[in-house]
């Protein structure tokens, strides 16, 4: 079974609905955001939508960090992290694999046409935004898999049978993260060496 990421696998309507809900996040009461977004993911199908939800919220977070943006980026990051406790370990791992697959396939240097073709990225994202997006997802994944709540909470509660069923998922996740790490180290370094500027 291939684990490469392809936009065509998910209907356009799901991307549009998730983008609409993500844009509305700051206007939803904080105590309702998790429930609303979880319900959206379940309605769309967690397997098909959770990774898109995380990636879309990450885009909003990165764009909101610009100096000219008045939106607080923590609205999106807080929702991303709080959603972790709302889904099963298998759903989280499978969604992480899809995020790593997606990021491994998008370029660090994108033209306006590239951005228009992508169903997740903002068409107004700058080159710095795209690089910061990669960095932010790396940071999110690190926070996720080093989280005390995830390790000593969700992972600690799985049964032996569930753990056996997760072995392949663990292997796939590690493989994808290693592949993505290679992308992180190779592409941006070569890009910045041509620009004579430091990476980050």
Language-model segments: residues:
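Structural marker for long, regular alpha helices in very large eukaryotic proteins
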Residues: 1-200
């Amino acid at each position: 079974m291939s684990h490469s990421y392809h936009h065509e696998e998910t209907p356009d309507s799901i991307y549009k609905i998730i983008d609409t809900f993500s844009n509305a996040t700051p206007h939803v009461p904080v105590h309702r955001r998790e429930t609303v977004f979880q319900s959206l993911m379940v309605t769309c199908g967690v397997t098909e939508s959770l990774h898109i939800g995380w990636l879309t919220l990450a885009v909003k977070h990165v764009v909101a960090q610009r100096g000219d943006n008045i939106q607080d980026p923590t609205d999106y990051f807080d929702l991303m992290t709080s959603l972790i406790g709302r889904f099963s370990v298998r759903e989280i791992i499978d969604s992480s694999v899809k995020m790593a697959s997606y990021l491994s396939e998008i370029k660090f240097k994108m033209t306006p046409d590239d951005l228009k073709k992508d169903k997740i990225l903002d068409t107004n994202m700058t080159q710095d935004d795209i690089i910061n997006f990669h960095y932010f997802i790396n940071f999110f994944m690190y926070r996720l898999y080093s989280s005390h709540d995830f390790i000593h909470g969700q992972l600690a509660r799985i049964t032996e049978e569930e753990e056996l069923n997760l072995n392949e998922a663990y292997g796939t996740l590690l493989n994808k993260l290693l592949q993505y790490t290679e992308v992180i180290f190779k592409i941006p370094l070569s890009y910045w060496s041509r620009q004579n500027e430091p990476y980050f």
